[in-house]
Amino acid sequence: MIVLHHLKNSRSTRIVWMLEELKVPYEIKVYDRVDGRAPPAYTKLSPLGKSPIVVDDGVTYIESAAILEHLVRKYGPSFKPSEEDVAELEKYELWMHFSEASLMPFIWASHVLDLSVNMTPIFFRYIVRQFVNGIKSKYLSKETFLNLDYIDNHLASNEYFAGEQFTAADPQMCFPIFAAQRDYLSQKPYKNIKRWMRVVSDRPACRIAAEKVEDNTLTLFSDVERYSHPPTPPPEQVRSDE
């Protein structure tokens, strides 16, 4: 029996999605965060305390890509291009690594910097906010948009990330794209990314996973229209030409 140790609002939602695609029996054990971190019971499973964690036949697996590769190899080889499909396999391998190695670091760094502003004493918060905004505008945002442009261009000629077939690379890419929705996907059309979001969020396995985990990662992931246009600034920020 596969046991997924699920930390709420975390990367493990992609594993629930993949398990539903595979249609294999599994159990979910849900953990609530404590002060934004994994609880002690979770760190007993792995000293890193990072989500996701999967236990399969007594063996503990960590890291999303490694877990997905294990599940596909053991339970669903059709969710990975075959060795004969070299072009598709190379796409698959690229996006399985791109998710956390290229895109997510910039989004996560921005998130941590925003948290640092909120944790700063109020008297110094304005100064820290200006410093953070400078880092984000001059480096992090530029790199994030560069990555999203690359993704959108790839999806212009590919139905899914590994080509014309849904693979484990699609759930793997869902988390950073979800994380980019609010601050980035509303700033440019990104019609191909949003087309992909609509397609995969309509898959029954994605919908079932969203209901099972009861957090917003996959639920908001399907709410693509919400991020199709730049947000309207509040009235006091609207400039008038009159």
Swiss-Prot record:
Residues 1-79 form the GST N-terminal domain. Pfam families: GST_C (PF00043), GST_N (PF02798). Induction: By heavy metals such as cadmium and mercury. Residues 85-234 form the GST C-terminal domain. SUPFAM superfamilies: GST C-terminal domain-like, Thioredoxin-like. One of its GO terms (biological process) is glutathione metabolic process. It catalyses: RX + glutathione = an S-substituted glutathione + a halide anion + H(+). The modification Phosphothreonine is found at T232. It is found in: Cytoplasm. The keyword Zinc-finger does not apply. May have a role in the detoxification of various heavy metals. Belongs to the GST superfamily. Interacts with sad1. This is Glutathione S-transferase 3. It comes from Schizosaccharomyces pombe (strain 972 / ATCC 24843) (Fission yeast).
